[in-house]
Amino acid sequence: MLLFTGAACGSGGDGSSGPAVVDLSEASGAAGVRGVSLGAPVAKPATTLVDTAGAPFDLRTDQATAGRVTLVFFGFTNCPDICPTTMADLDAALESLPAADRDRIRVVFVSTDPDRDTGPVIRRWLDQFDASFIGLTGTWPHIKEFADALDVAIEPAVREADGTVNVTHSAQVTAFSPDGTARVAYLTGTSVADYAHDLPLLARGET
């Protein structure tokens, strides 16, 4: 099933935006949580990306994410709307939780604009929201492979004649449980209260 849940964000020009597509096959409401249930469980991608310090990062084995709830979002730092809104909402939701719950959850931002989003650029941008947020980048083929493993639709950046750079990406947040499997995702319209309700349940493996 194709869901229009993202935006083709523009930067460097008039900042125009339009719809993007994310494929959530057989998505439906998930029992007990406010996210949507994925049609089939999704394993963490085997593709290794690069963190903001330039070190290889494997979502499956890195000590920052192994055994923790891991929320993965694809976007870019020049995004004028959905990316900063999503990061701010996740930060607000985490801030509302007890410290013990927060420590069991990690947010991972994967850049879909690797030519402009260098490690330091991503790090400065994420630090506006939460210094614990993990930023990843890499070559476009590796980023696309990573996204494809999650059934998340992204497209390479396109520079228009007027200098505007359009980057089409999904608004989906994929939630991996501590066992390394994603069964739930969050789409446009998810509120801070929705995240705050679900994250402790995910951390306890109650999905």
Task: Label each PLM-derived region with a short phrase.
Residues T85-F146:
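Structural microenvironment flanking redox-active thiols in thiol-disulfide oxidoreductases
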Residues H142-D198:
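Thiol/disulfide oxidoreductase modules built on the thioredoxin-like
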Residues K44-P45, T70, S170-Q172:
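Short loop/turn microsegments at loop-to-beta-strand junctions
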Residues R60-L90:
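Short active-site neighborhood of thiol/selenol oxidoreductases, capturing the structured segment around
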Residues M1-V50, E206-T207:
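N-terminal targeting signals for export/organelle localization
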Residues F57-D58, R183:
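Generic structural signal for well-ordered beta-strand positions
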Residues F76-P80, V110-T112, S132-F133, V184:
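Second-shell loop/turn segments in exported
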Residues T52-A53, P178:
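Short, ordered coil/turn segments that flank beta-strands lining enzyme active or ligand-binding pockets
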